[in-house]
Amino acid sequence: MSTATRVTAASVVPTAKVEPLTCAIGAEVQNVNLGAAARDPGLMAEIRSLLLEYKVLVFRDQDITRAEHVTFARHFGELEDHPVAGSDPDHPGLVRVYKSPEKPNDRYENAWHTDATWREKPPFGCVLRCVECPPVGGDTMWANMALAHDRLPEHIKRQITGLRARHSIEATFGAAMPIEKRLALKAQYPDAEHPVVRTHPETGEKILFVNGFTTHFTNFHTAANVRYGQDFAPGAAQLLQYLISQAQIPEYQVRWRQPNSVAFWDNRSTQHYAVMDYPPCHRKMERAGIIGDTPF
């Protein structure tokens, strides 16, 4: 879809304008109020189309209520409850991520990840509103994992075809918990297994689908076709870390910070990273995660 076509397609709201943020990922959608958007089926269809193309959409100057935030997100599917962060009691599915000098880093930042891949059905996408950001710092970064897959060396693509991997909440959110609480968390949210390369259910893109929640391959074989267990085959751990590190390549990324703005990303085809570089300042974000489907 060309840029000209994109702007024309937004004619359901004639003043809408779409500006790509980088060559790889992300676009700013201007002159759209998300509080009113949910009442316009044509506009919502266009937003979904733009999301599939750009993977991350940002909307400035969104003076919306929590109820409008939830209503917009719920248009794309039911909202999830986060097992660790919890939800706003008055707006189920809306998670408050408030950071201050008095609250230490609690593992929501400084790690590349795709949200909740430890679920059998990881989120379709997430809608994040910046309530308050520090004067400098506090960016959120996203990486295009379809592009990351496309640019892998061909021999790596062949090597990972058909591979599957385990994803765990215990190894991340549970890592700093007392053992009893950690085991209870894992019992409630057992590990999930997903393909290392998933197919996007709407675009057909091949996506590199490993991240900070991924612990090991479950069917890795050596060249001699000998199994050594979960992740003990020579080279398995190194290969996994190599794949996870692809999100760190700047050419695949976009970053954003703007008070009162909203970011909407396709969780199926991206990773993201909240940069913890702003203490002693405040950062207040509110997020709605949309339930997705089983990766294939």
Regions found by a protein language model. Give the residues of each.
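Non-heme Fe(II) oxygenase catalytic core, chiefly the N-lobe of the double-stranded beta-helix
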Residues: S2-V262, N267-F296
